[in-house]
């Protein structure tokens, strides 16, 4: 019994389709083009962990603009630049009409985590990158800007969770400094080795959950 051979053109078409599929999967994401579920919609549906205290501020057009993120490309780490202040005090400042600033999350001196802005909305923390980033502000005990152990642990935990729900990678975690050159978060800007250690701790935390 003879087997009918497929025309060579069929194999050429299949080969071309495989090449195109590979391009879609590997090249387009580098230009911010993704296939499948909307990453911002995934953030909107994410279940915030029980250890996060959700105190969402009201839409005021400034601190909370109420605008949807255009994309999610980075997680930005900040420090509050107000030594000794609590997460709650900084949250309450965001609510003040004169503040004009906010972040998605605040981490306090005892490791408490407060959510201020919904994950799928702009915060007012990272300048021109507000449109495609999630921001975390961390409290610190003194002018050096170094985070204490409780705050640091929560920062690693929160950042790892955000990477999980956003689909980002540890290399997508950046400092405010990396956007504007601002001395923020101060200790991680002035101590590059500590920043790299933090990224390693985040990567280890992500791996531990997989």
Region locations from a protein language model:
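Residues immediately flanking
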Residues: 79, 138, 177
